[in-house]
Curated annotation (Swiss-Prot):
The lineage of its organism: Bacteria, Bacillati, Bacillota, Bacilli, Lactobacillales. It comes from the Bacteria. It holds the Pfam family Com_YlbF. Signal peptide: none annotated. Belongs to the UPF0342 family. This is UPF0342 protein SPy_0811/M5005_Spy0626. It comes from Streptococcus pyogenes serotype M1.
Length: 113
């Protein structure tokens, strides 16, 4: 039985990769990577996101200047069709991932009830 659970997990991984929503994220990501300005903007977003997450994990909040930078970056992303499509595709995929997470972790929740 223990090996079987890994087989199921691998099957789930393949199923996620086959989802049209997953394929859409890949497609849009490739388009972003082919566009220098979109790619730079995406890299800037990732760096900003990592910085903010690191700050919050250490109990710090973004300064007013950093919040302004975040807002400006968000506006640039909204104005870029490829990045906008990427985040929309990510959102559609995250619905599946959220549902899968809920299903997979249901037995663990039962243990703490």
């Amino acid at each position: 039985m223990s090996q079987e659970i890994y087989d199921y997990a691998n099957q789930l991984e393949r199923a996620v990769r086959a989802l049209p929503e997953y394929q859409k994220v890949l497609e849009v990501k490739e388009a972003i990577q082919a566009d220098v300005s979109a790619s730079e903007l995406f890299d800037e977003f990732v760096a900003m996101q990592e910085k903010i997450q690191g700050m919050m994990q250490s109990g710090q909040m973004p300064t007013a200047e950093e919040q302004t930078s975040i807002q400006e970056l968000s506006q640039k992303i909204e104005a870029n069709d490829q990045l906008k499509a990427y985040f929309e595709a990510q959102q559609a995929l995250s619905v599946y991932m959220s549902d899968i997470e809920r299903i997979v972790f249901a037995p663990l929740k039962d243990l703490v009830k």
